[in-house]
Amino acid sequence: MKSYFKFLGRHRLFTIINIVGLCLSMAFLLLLGDLIYRQTSVENFQSRGERIFALGNEEFTMSHFRVGQKLQDRFPEIEAWCSVSGYNAMFDIRGMEVQTEILVVAPNFFEFFDYQLLTGDKHKVLEAPNQMVVSKKFAKRYWPDGDAVGKEVVLGDKNDPDGHVTYTISGIMDDFDRSVIPSSHECVVNLESHKHFNYSAYTEEMNNAGSSVLFLMQREGADLRSKTDAMREYMKTFFWLYRMDAVKQVTLTPLSTLYYDAKECSFQSGDLNHGNRDMAHLYVVIALLVLVFAIFNYVNLSVSLTTERSKEMATRRLLGLSRLQVFLKLIGESIFFTAIAFGVAYLVALALQDKAVEMAACPMDLLKDTGIVTIIGFVLIIAVVGALAGFVPASILSGYQPIDIVRGTFRRRVRQRWSHVLMVIQAVFAIVMLTVTLLLSGNIREKMQQPLGYDYENILETWGINNLSLTQRQTYRQKLLQMPEVDGVGYGYGTPLDFLENNTTQADDGTVVSMRYLMGDSCFFNILNIHPEKTYSDTGVGVNHQLLRQFGKSDDAKEIVTNSGNINFHIAALYPDIIYQTVMNEEKHPTPILIDKVDEYRDDSTSFVQRMYGSPRMAIVKYHGNREKVEGKMKVLFQEFTGHEAPEAHSLEQKHQEWYEDYERFLSVLTVFTFVALLIAILGLMAMNSYFVGQRRREIAVRRVFGAELSSITLRLLRTVVVQSLVAAVIAIPLAYWLAPTAGSISGLHVEMQFMPLLLSLIIVLVVNVLTAAIQSWRAATENPVNSIKNE
């Protein structure tokens, strides 16, 4: 090893470039490996996980909790059922207002699943409606002395005898980890609590057909999936969702694959933990390509420097070492070098872990997940990568006879091999990665900047307004309008950037229509700048073009009446189509919207909206100038009226950006990979050009002696690099045309190939190639030819 260390010391550029390349690529592989391990091991601790299925349909993996008991009574293949729902909640704990997320579950939750219960009897902790189980993290936060069991938690106004519910903590569970249930859910209560959070999720009519994730446990030896057709027919007799053919299939998704395979599976408090299997595979492929890229660099540079160690290897052969012994020595050195790079990569991965968690929005813990089996895997990876990286240079050095090295024929043969092909491959990879990144980045930015059909800039929204009386709402608006920064205050039930109330029905031709209700007062619609294209009367509802299209009506229709009698309303106004939530969703599934607009919400028992949904739930405030001042005033007024801490105010612009977070994360990861790939490519090209020019120093010196111009020598050297770049471009263009739409479809984007990103990528890679070669060539051309000839 002593001679190897001397070699690394003499060639510091070689050492640095290979350490950087292997280190960064393996660090990414470590992080991605931990990410995928955690994703693929979600819920794998469930002892009956293979027998537990989530009930759903072709549209979403959700149902109503009352369906569970009906199916169990009908189908003996079902051993048990358990429903899970999630809500945002605000509690009073010893006078402190606490915001958290809560699960409303069937009483058998801790018997059905293997989530660890640290304190309490799993058969009894949720048998009463007022019992609550809290997470270890939640208990430690509010009862650090460890005496949480038996304490009371109050939902609602504790000073109002009819307006609050008191829960008693009956047990403590471990925090949710490697589960489809987000760890932000810290409290668990009996399903009777649906009445306090979402009454439509409790009613026997099962109006809220997707209020719960319903799990069915199959009896051992049974085949529950063979009963899906029978389940569908049975549910047509009692479940309106199937009776009116709003959905046509029954799906059973195993708990073990729910993380990847669930469709539209969420709680009211947010989505369940989920992943995209194709995207995970794409990340791994890219990371492996970056590693291959780094190995190419190692091979390329090692081959270029084989002549530097040729005399050493010739001497070893002459001293009695066999060809195999020389080969194994070189492979051992490569594995040792890879092991050093891997050690550094592990430390780099630990340093980048928090940033990776933020970008991937998925928990990782590399240190915690490193066990004996993992370490054995690491050793195998080091051995394989080291052997692959060292195979080619070891084969070359051990394959020639010592006499070839003494004569100098070895040097002449090696100079012409490997480097050209590997440099072309590097350039191809760089062009394709850069093209895909630029194209997807431009596509996402374009969609984010696309007009939505309404205003969202300089608008704040806040919820909980349903806690205010009519007089308080009027005073709230009046006092805010007294501020010079406030331009308007409107009340409603949600903006197009929120989850709007919906009603699923059926048109006469059998088309299932899932309408969204956009409801607000006149100020609400003025602030959003949503106005009708046509107004027919003062009574009735507004509709957009998409709603008319789905019911098979023309744009001048004045009413919609279905033969079944489910729908019968008068059209007062026609509104333009608007984007509901994201452009991507709207492109796939245009949203029919029913608009209910009133001058002002009063306590009107005859109002359909207020009878169904209660008082207005939220306010939007149009402002200019100092946002913090307006936000502060909103909080002060809410607390003054209710005595409770005000919910956070959010800007609609921020909510608009949040809808694109998944796409932004994907783009961020892809950008990082591209940057690393380009960095490795640039370093490799710099080194290769340096060694390539270095090997031709004698030729350059001889040409200088015979009077060649510096420019002609430089251009002659650059010709090879330009040809390599052109060959790379020819290969990269069809690859980019194929890969960009594929990567886009995996991330949920419809991407069409554009010329400019491809052209820009070609120019960037060509400039980097030519510039690095030009600098090295110019330095070689301007060097004193005497030194080059003397050294040869």
State each model region's role:
Residues A106-T119, M132-G275, T475-Q478, Q482-E658:
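Mid-to-C-terminal secondary-structure elements
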Residues M1-I19, S269-L272, S302-G332, A339, ...:
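Alpha-helical transmembrane segments of integral membrane proteins
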Residues H644-A729, T742-S745:
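C-terminal transmembrane helical bundles of large multi-pass transporters
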Residues K6, R10-R12, Q46, M235-A287, ...:
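Membrane-helix entry/capping segments
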Residues L32-M90, R94-M96, Y202-T203, N208-F215, ...:
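Membrane-proximal extracellular/periplasmic loop immediately following the first transmembrane helix
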Residues R10-Q39, H274-K311, A339, G343, ...:
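Hydrophobic alpha-helical transmembrane segments of multi-pass inner-membrane transport and secretion
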Residues I16, G21, E312-D354, A677, ...:
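Transmembrane alpha-helical interface segments in multi-pass membrane proteins
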